[in-house]
Amino acid sequence: MRRGIRLAIIILMVLLYVTSNHGASADEWEEGFFKANQAYKVGDFQEAIEEYLRLIRSGHGGGQIYYNLGNAYFRAGQLGRAILEYERAQLLMPRDPDLNFNLSHARDQVRDAIEESRGFIEAAFFWLESFNLNELFWSFALLNLLLWAILIIRLFHKTEWLYYMLLLILSAWFVTGLSFGLKYYWISNDDRVVILQKEVNILAGPEEDDTVLFKLHEGTVVFQERSEDGWSLVRLPDKKRGWVKSRAIGLISCGSPVTSTSPHPLPTQRFPVH
């Protein structure tokens, strides 16, 4: 009996500790977000950028934060970083009309007219561009529950309509599971990078005195093949490749699946640039 009481007290204390920490974290997030928004409103875009970045580094990032950060960069005249943050936001909220408009508007400012080609798999699974990883995961989880529920019911009621329902759910379960797996793989292996500097030389090798093959400009999206000693080998969709300083590019997916939004369901304030 005493052990049970002690265990209950310990569990209660842990829950209180976690809840209080979560509340404090939420307060910090709200305060930082408010400061960033206020700075943006008065035109202090650099201060807004620093506050949004502080939120992201503390683990409070999300689609809306990346979106607002992209807008702040755009207003501050940093086109490359604006496109980088818009692309990151699009991984989390791909159907957002304001984001898609602003990203398209920012892309129109890029000097290099390079169109990204789509492979056969991307074209075949075209709908994946409209869903983020979380949406696909929870859709798959829900269909999995429905599938098991119908299988259990069919143990006792083998009716014709349940059979067709089972086939329908099974098909949707398979397609959704495959879609989630492909989306996870694509994000995990997303090697797209954005040129962050006004103009960069693409060299034949990872040395300052190597031959300049061509130039790329701020906001251009290319692919990173590998990096070594502060240099990155990048590739264009037309297969042209060369070396550039790693500090001149920004990786869109950061090499890992992006699945989360902000951990605190607070109202977000958005700042369209159009």
Question: Where are each of the predicted segments found?
Answer:
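Boundary regions of SH3-family modules and the immediately adjacent low-complexity/disordered segments
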Residues: 79, 163-197, 204-207, 211, ...
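Membrane-embedded alpha-helical segments of integral membrane proteins
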Residues: 112, 116-154
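Conserved beta-strand/loop element in small beta-rich adapter and peptidoglycan-binding domains
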Residues: 210-228
